[in-house]
Design a protein with these regions (language model features):
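Carboxylate-rich, polar loop motifs that coordinate divalent cations or form catalytic acidic clusters
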Residues: 1-305
Length: 305
């Protein structure tokens, strides 16, 4: 960041300019307005501001130019007491704050107005979107913001405030039709959204229609990662993982029962390396499962601990 390294620590944030460190933290009598000095997450937006998530689930924007902090939303404003668990920074500069039980807050920066902030709360309480739990936000290549929630999908067009809703349930309408969505993968012509019971809904960009992909599992799909132009690796919370060919619509299932090298524990995350090989994080101390798509072999890597 402009020849500086920034570090989020349990005692404020630190800037290293190549020679010395400078610490920014709230002390008695100083001007720094951090509500908690333990900073668990830090992100940079396209305007050069740093967004900090502190231990007390509050969010602060830091301006490196003026070396000032501001709480977002501002203290006393609606949303300032929400417990935020995730900050998601979009490519266009929009920042989303995902809360524990109050939906999501969309923060807009106005660079032509001295970087003034405005925000809207998307939740069933404000009636902007019928959900209290937003799991993820994805900005597609056309600039639309997609909300993946426990009650369907929302799509907000660029420059708009009101979202289009898909697979949502409202009172007295479409009872039981709502679905939760947890993960997303975008390609040139479609966007795949992962749901429960092995369902993936593929949004066709040209027609605006959804088509259903069903995998033979009752598990919740937790992530989708491309490993080849038409092939993805798809993880579940309780039933291992799949490889799926989007062109031929065929899949291969690697479960705990049929693949002995795969620990019988939930897959927490997956990482695809430069060789398109996949590494799985699971609830198994000292163990990493490794998948080679070229050979179809899963190996169990033991880390000395």
């Amino acid at each position: 960041h402009k020849d500086n390294l920034w570090f989020a620590t349990w005692d404020g944030i630190n800037r290293f300019n190549g020679y010395t460190f400078k610490t920014y933290k709230a002390r008695q009598g100083n001007y720094i307005s951090l509500t908690n000095n333990r900073v668990d997450r830090m992100y940079e937006d396209r305007y050069g501001f740093l967004w900090l998530l502190t231990y007390d689930n509050r969010v602060h924007r830091f301006d490196p130019k003026t070396e000032t902090f501001e709480q977002v939303p501002a203290a006393g404003e609606e949303g300032s007491a929400f417990n935020v668990h995730t900050i998601e920074v979009m490519p266009n500069g929009t920042v989303w704050l995902l809360t524990e039980n109050d939906g999501a807050i969309r923060i807009l920066t106005h660079p032509d107005e001295n970087n003034r902030l405005t925000w809207d709360i998307y939740s069933s309480k404000t009636e902007l979107f019928p959900s209290l739990h937003v799991f993820k936000v994805h900005q597609d290549k056309a600039g639309n913001d997609w909300l993946l929630t426990d009650n369907g999908l929302g799509m907000i067009h660029p420059g708009k405030k009101e979202p289009d809703s898909y697979f949502t349930e409202t009172k007295g309408k479409f009872g039981g039709m709502n679905q939760a969505f947890y993960a997303v993968q975008e390609r040139d012509k479609d966007i795949c959204f992962a749901s429960d019971h092995g369902r993936i809904w593929s949004y066709q960009k040209e027609s605006g229609e959804f088509t259903l992909i069903e995998l033979p599992t009752k598990g919740q799909i937790t992530s989708i990662h491309p490993i080849a132009p038409d092939v993805s690796v798809i993880t579940t919370d309780s039933d291992g993982f799949f490889t799926y060919n989007l062109r031929t619509k065929t899949n291969v299932h690697y479960s705990f029962l049929t693949c002995k090298a795969l620990p019988a524990k939930p897959i927490l995350s997956a990482y695809v390396d430069r060789s398109s090989e996949v590494w799985f994080e699971q609830e198994e101390p000292g163990v990493v499962a490794h998948f080679n798509p070229s050979t179809g072999v899963v190996t169990r890597e033991q880390i000395p601990i």
